[in-house]
Swiss-Prot record:
Highly expressed in kidney, adrenal and colon; detected at lower levels on lung, liver, and spleen. Expressed in oocytes. Expressed in uterine tissues and in corpora lutea. The active site is at Y232 (proton acceptor). The lineage of its organism: Eukaryota, Metazoa, Chordata, Craniata, Vertebrata. InterPro entries: NAD(P)-bd_dom_sf, Sc_DH/Rdtase_CS, SDR_fam. The keyword NAD applies. It comes from Bos taurus (Bovine). NAD(+) binds at residues 82-111. This is 11-beta-hydroxysteroid dehydrogenase type 2.
Amino acid sequence: MESWPWPSGGAWLLVPARALLQLLRADLRLGRPLLAALALLAALDWLCQRLLPPLAALAVLAATGWIVLSRLARPQRLPVATRAVLITGCDSGFGNATAKKLDTMGFTVLATVLDLNSPGALELRACCSSRLKLLQMDLTKPGDISRVLEFTKVHTPSTGLWGLVNNAGQNIFVADAELCPVATFRTCMEVNFFGALEMTKGLLPLLRRSSGRIVTVSSPAGDMPFPCLAAYGTSKAALALLMGNFSCELLPWGVKVSIIQPACFKTESVKDVHQWEERKQQLLATLPQELLQAYGEDYIEHLNGQFLHSLSQALPDLSPVVDAITDALLAAQPLRRYYPGHGLGLIYFIHYYLPEGLRQRFLQSFFISPYVPRALQAGQPGLTSARDIAQDQGPRPDPSPTAQ
């Protein structure tokens, strides 16, 4: 097909014009992303000249250039000014790191901790400004929640509270849902769901007054059935759905709601191998004899070993999560969901677009290898993998994959 240079020229006039305007407003991120975008446009230009009519080529090039430059625009940020933010779960991990960053940015930070004498609390007291206030709170105790809510109402400016960061969370046991006591599910719901619900409802009058932000740290375990995280994942699923409701209902008030879905990061609780060993022993000590005989102690040992191995590969740098929380608090148009960390795109793609059998097999191989309980083993001593049992049984008449 005949080459048409004028669509190319028209598009390359429009794109640099917008880029120049963004540069003048300091609204364009420079560096490798910009170079990659220009290379993409050049390749697309070459294809359009050879494959499309002139008007179609101009439309495709101009639209692509406009979209690319929009994605490269620096997100507009609101000034910190005298904004106040309350963060739960600041003893360690994401909450602790976020409290320190927001304090350095000039926020008034109300940081709740489980223990005022914990290492994380002492660190915050030592390194942060006098604007940061430490508040003791256990989300399973209504009295603690009421005290923090009352303190916040008294000590926030007349404009109200700008942001609430629901960060506190808990995971207790790593085991099949049948092996976890019902009390474990209740505890996870109390901390991860009902605690966040009470804090959000209690602070909504202040947040509505300021047209502020609600930022909630959830988990991919609430979106997909990771093996052996049923209690934790169920509570996070309920939490994410609740925040979706708040997002719709608070829209007329100007309150924006964001959910953070981080990958696995190396927080203090993740690194605490002794804690996971203690919880495993606690589970074994309280497990009914019938379940212990059916599953076997070696099965639970294996699950915890695999879980600790997966945690050893956790991401050490917490800044992507802290940056996501900060953006949700200050961006003029924050995202509804943030996915900080590597590998989440692939996991969500598999979860949403592949057949259910493949999804379940992937989650098992990604997180915990499919070893079988003692009662299902084929008579061999020790652990036997599901693959070994399948080989012993010979080929099945139905070759279609089944979920483990």
